[in-house]
Amino acid sequence: MARVVALVLLGLLSLTGLEAVQRIPKVQVYSRHPAENGKPNFLNCYVSGFHPPEIEIDLLKNGEKMKVDRSDLSFSKDWSFYLLVHTDFTPNGVDEYSCRVQHSTLKEPLIVKWDRDL
């Protein structure tokens, strides 16, 4: 009898599926310090709440990829992931900075511009 119950439970689990829910990434772009033209700073792109963990994150200067460093991929209590990508930069009031995120939950890359006033 216990074997039958175990087989029924196993069958029910296979019907419901065990795959994790896919989650769309949340993107925040910000500088470490308030922006001052000509003063070195750090540009951060913090991407959180996404699943599955495979993701591509680029910081862009006038649409061109910048050389970046990144934190280790980490996960939250709800098993969603987060990652910080960052680089040093010197704002000048002319160049435009943004973060581009590509993830399986997105139909096209998500681009979030840095707002120097935030």
From Swiss-Prot:
UniProt keyword list: Disulfide bond, Immunity, Immunoglobulin domain, MHC I, Secreted, Signal
Domain Ig-like C1-type: 25-111
Subcellular location: Secreted
Stored Gene3D superfamilies: Immunoglobulins (2.60.40.10)
GO BP terms in the entry: antigen processing and presentation of peptide antigen via MHC class I; immune response
GO cellular component terms, A-Z: extracellular region; MHC class I protein complex
PROSITE patterns, A to Z: IG_LIKE, IG_MHC
Major site of localization recorded for this protein: secreted
Cleavable signal peptide: 1-20
Superkingdom of the source species: Eukaryota
S-S bonds: 45-99
Keyword Hydrolase attached: no
Assembly behavior: Heterodimer of an alpha chain and a beta chain. Beta-2-microglobulin is the beta-chain of major histocompatibility complex class I molecules.
Function: Component of the class I major histocompatibility complex (MHC). Involved in the presentation of peptide antigens to the immune system.
Family stated for the protein in its record: Belongs to the beta-2-microglobulin family.
The protein, known as: Beta-2-microglobulin
